[in-house]
């Protein structure tokens, strides 16, 4: 389980998995604040990485990073997100023992966002740099979720794995349990984001396959 910017369901999931004889994997789908890139509003670019604990020390490090995000870098007002700063990840590199696995974030990760913007060379550079920094603990996410962007993303993601000898991992983000729950999820999201459900110009972040 990898909750968005938190470990909210970790303990309940851990207990349920252990009772069923399944090894639980705990992590965070983290929002990372870039130290060098900006978005269309000239604010620090925010991208996703999935951080998974390899062991108890890794779990403790996730707690530390997540707490730091909420204490030191939480947004104000309607923007109450708690983003990890990119430079904090250097602590994972400098550690004597690697305790965390890092997944690239898929289409919403740094690599995915750069591909979407057409900054292909920068995307490949980012993949190479992250591979060099995190070694065998870094994986490129491969995902097919029905988005208009998935074909282009998959082509480059597979090519990166081959070019830089990076490890691929198949993922599927799920935001609701059953396919028929899509409309309820969209409604809930629009309430939280103060958007109008039937606004044709509203950004479509989810689709019916994300279950």
What positions do the PLM features span?
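Phosphodiester-processing cores and adjacent nucleic acid-binding clamps
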Residues: 1-211
């Amino acid at each position: 389980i990898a909750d968005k910017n938190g470990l909210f369901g970790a303990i309940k999931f851990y207990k349920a998995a252990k009772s069923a004889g399944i090894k639980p994997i705990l992590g965070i789908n983290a929002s990372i604040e870039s130290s060098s890139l900006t978005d269309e509003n000239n604010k620090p670019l925010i991208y996703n990485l999935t951080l998974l604990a390899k062991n108890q020390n890794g779990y403790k490090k996730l707690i530390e990073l997540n707490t730091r995000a909420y204490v030191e870098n939480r947004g104000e007002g309607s923007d109450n997100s708690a983003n990890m700063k990119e430079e904090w990840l250097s602590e994972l590199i400098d550690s004597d023992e690697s305790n965390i696995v890092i997944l690239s974030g898929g289409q919403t990760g740094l690599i995915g966002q750069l591909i979407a913007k057409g900054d292909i060379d920068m995307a490949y550079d980012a993949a190479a740099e992250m591979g060099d920094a995190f070694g065998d603990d870094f994986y490129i996410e491969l995902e097919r979720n029905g988005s208009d962007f998935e074909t282009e993303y998959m082509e480059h993601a597979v090519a990166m794995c081959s070019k830089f000898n990076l490890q691929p991992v198949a993922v599927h983000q799920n935001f609701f349990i059953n396919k028929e729950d899509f409309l309820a999820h969209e409604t809930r999201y629009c309430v939280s984001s103060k958007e109008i459900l039937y606004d044709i110009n509203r950004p479509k972040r989810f689709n019916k396959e994300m279950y």
